[in-house]
């Protein structure tokens, strides 16, 4: 757990944003500068809604709250990454050629945090999801494979893709979205 951090989880409409706004207000009333307050969420939609409500309530701008970001944007900016450092559609296409799987999709840039996220489809997408989930959860690959319960997938292919992905990222000095979070946590 991070010192001075609070984790707020819940389904849509349960008051997460309201609770966070109240906490931000309390900190501002204590004299904490807005640039010293961070709110992190999984989605750009949630952060966009939060920033809009916070700016409206406190009569401030988005620039006043530089640490209201998605998890990935926090890692991306915290690590000082540039677009060239991140696995792109072209990188996944090269990797797919090496592995004889498809990582189809397009790069889509978030308007809220400027991070380009490849949306994956194709025969390799499920494998990448399992690999990334293993990193996020800090769990073994075999656990995540079994958890998926997809009998159309091959564990040996999963291991091959993970190994090739790690090698490719190492040789090209690229990171993927799971790396952004994991590496940022390592230095934080």
What are these regions (language model features)?
Residues 78, 90-91, 179:
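Solvent-exposed, flexible loop/coil residues
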Residues 1-85:
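P-loop NTPase Walker
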Residues 88-115:
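Conserved phosphoryl-transfer catalytic core
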Residues 1-10, 18-19, 36, 109-188:
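Accessory N-terminal region flanking or inserted into the helicase ATPase core
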Residues 16, 91-95, 154:
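Residue-level preference for long, well-ordered alpha-helices that form the structural scaffold
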Residues 32, 69, 87-90, 153, ...:
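Short coil/turn linker and secondary-structure boundary residues
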């Amino acid at each position: 757990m991070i010192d001075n951090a609070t984790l707020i989880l819940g389904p849509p409409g349960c008051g997460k944003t309201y609770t966070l706004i109240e906490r931000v207000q309390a900190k501002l009333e204590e004299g904490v500068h807005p640039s010293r307050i961070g709110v992190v969420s999984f989605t750009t939609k949630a952060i966009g809604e939060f920033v809009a409500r916070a700016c409206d309530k406190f009569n401030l701008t988005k620039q006043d709250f530089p640490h209201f970001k998605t998890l990935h944007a926090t890692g991306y900016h915290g690590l000082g990454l540039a677009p060239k450092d991140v696995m792109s559609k072209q990188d996944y296409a090269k990797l797919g050629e090496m592995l004889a799987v498809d990582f189809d999709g397009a790069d889509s840039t978030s308007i809220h945090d400027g991070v380009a996220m490849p949306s994956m489809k194709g025969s390799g997408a499920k494998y990448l999801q399992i690999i990334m989930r293993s990193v996020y959860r800090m769990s073994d690959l075999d656990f995540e494979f079994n958890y998926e319960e997809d009998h159309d997938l091959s564990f040996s292919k999963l291991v091959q893709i993970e190994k090739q992905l790690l090698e490719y990222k190492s040789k090209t000095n690229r990171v993927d979205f799971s790396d952004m979070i994991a590496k940022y946590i390592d230095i934080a």
